[in-house]
Amino acid sequence: DYEHGVIGDLPNFPSFRGGVALGPYLESVFGIPVYVNNDGNLFAYGEALAGALPRVNKALEDAGCKRRYKNLIGITLGTGFGCGVVIDKVLLKGDNDCGGDVWCMRNGMYPFVIAEESVSIRAVRRVYAEMSHEEIGDLTPKDIGDIANGTRPGNMKAAQESFRQLGQVTAATLVNVLNIVDGIVVIGGGLTGNAKWILPGIMEEFARLAGTFSGNLLPTLQSEVYNFEDPEQRAAFLEDKDVYVDVPHTDKKVLYQAQRKVAVLVSELGASKAINLGAYNFAINQIEK
């Protein structure tokens, strides 16, 4: 319960049960206002105000493109699968403080398992162990990334596949979110050091088609997704394909955005800085209410 600063029955905080009034307690200790939110939300908020969203809009401006973006989905890939949504500078809270939660959504590869089981540090380790048939030991995602890059001994294909699968399930989850929010996607968190192995799985899944009973194939996203980290795709994303069309029975013309498109990019701020910026701005907004 972020509004009242109370931590409830969270699966990853077993010591907090029955409601712990953390915010009010810290206020009483330090004598200053205290506000509570989660890292996924604050990461997205920081990126929307001072990171990915301004970066994309500045690139569009520099390219002479008239389009601007107002909505952002921020995801953090690390110990778990975090997500936050910002719509026109407003952080999506939800009526139950669950706005943007995706970790417990259905897994795109294993429908009876939650998404986070394939989008987390433990997922990378599990897939590598399964595919390499090696004892995982204390290998970290950094180690597995080094194996994927060929700078550490190990099963390179298994290492690369462990990150590709993470990207695939990430995108399978985000397809539904993107169809509702319709904005830029920014990725952050500890696993993004291996983004070059994660992004192919994301883009592959975003391009997946779904059928109808009559046999037609349709894209699962209404907008085309571009990998902003790829120079060719970034250039295509920044290309202005908007046109002016005639207003019937008048001499007027109106702008028509002929192409629906969104972009996926990796955080330049980094998760820690984005979260700090998000937390600062969130607190300022709460104080000014």
For each predicted feature, which ranges?
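Anion-binding (especially nucleotide phosphate/pyrophosphate-binding) glycine-rich loop
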Residues: 18-32, 40, 55
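Active-site nucleophile and cofactor-binding loops and adjacent substrate-binding regions
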Residues: 12-17, 35-43, 74-77, 266-274
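Short beta-strand scaffold segments in enzyme catalytic cores
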Residues: 1, 74-76, 81-86
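Short beta-strand-to-turn element immediately C-terminal to the catalytic PLP-Schiff-base lysine
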Residues: 47, 84-88, 92-94, 107
